Structure formats: C-alpha cells, structure tokens
Amino acid sequence: PVDIPDNFYDGERPTTVPFQLPPARKIPTHPIQEQDKEKLHAIRVAFQSSWGAYKLNAWGMDEYHPLSKSGTNLLLKDESPVGFTIVDALDTLIILGMEEDYMDARNWIRDELSWDVDGRLNVFETTIRILGGLLSASALMLDPPAGTLRASHEDSIFFLTRAQELAAR
C-alpha cells in the first residue's frame, strides 16, 4: 500500500501541463466568408422544415420520427411528455430569430412541462437535452448574439429557474 499524507488533497494541485484559455472573441455579426451565406441559408431552411414537421405531427412529444410522421415519449406514455425536443431546440430557435416558434416553445415549457412524472428518465439525456437546453436558453436570452431574438431578462430568469427546479430533483 502507498502511504498518502492526510493533507495530500488539501489546497490546489498544480497541473502537469499549463493550460491557458484562448482569448475571448466576439461572435461574428455577419458571415465570415461569402460561401457562409449559402450555408447559413441551407441550415435555416433545413431547421425550419424539420421544426415545422415536429410541430405539425408530434408537438409536445419527446422525440419525432419523420418517416412515420409521429412522436414518442421516452417514458412510453402519451400523458407524460418531458418535451426533450422542444427544450433541446430552444437555443436554435433563439439564434435563428424564430420568434413565434420560440414563444410557442417557451409557453409550452411554462404551461405543460412538469417534472412530476412516473417512470425512470435517462440521466444523461435529461442532463444534456433538458438541463443544457434550459441553461443555454437562459444565457442566450440574457445576452443574445446580434441579429437574433431580443434580450429578455424575464425569460432568462424563467429558464434558469426551471433548470434549478430540475437540478434540485
């Protein structure tokens, strides 16, 4: 056995390789290169098409299946959606400036999303998609990039509060 002194883990431990964060850069307010405009347009069209199909065929469901044009919930109960897709898409709705769709998603989270569900949720998926989605939406609504939705301190606090509610469970 190796003898480890009682105070071995006290204080800061130096890293073996010095690590420096890169300097902060502002988010570009316009495409960096001319071909970026075409790519940005293609991304917007693809997202709007996918999001529109989800809203039409599976609104509120956790997952959307485009081939069958149907949705499912991860708990396999229609009455217990957690809204994985809605919350996961919030940051994209904000960045693309899709205000009406953003409002629909925000209102669904306000009116329908409940943590009081019976069943077992995947901790990884819940953390990255729901908790991550709420936290990124909170940060983006506090200080959105230029050309996206207008900042909303109220919405930022709302999403942060919902994230805290989930994290406390």
What are these regions (language model features)?
Residues 1-169:
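Glycan-recognition and catalytic cores of secretory/periplasmic carbohydrate-active enzymes
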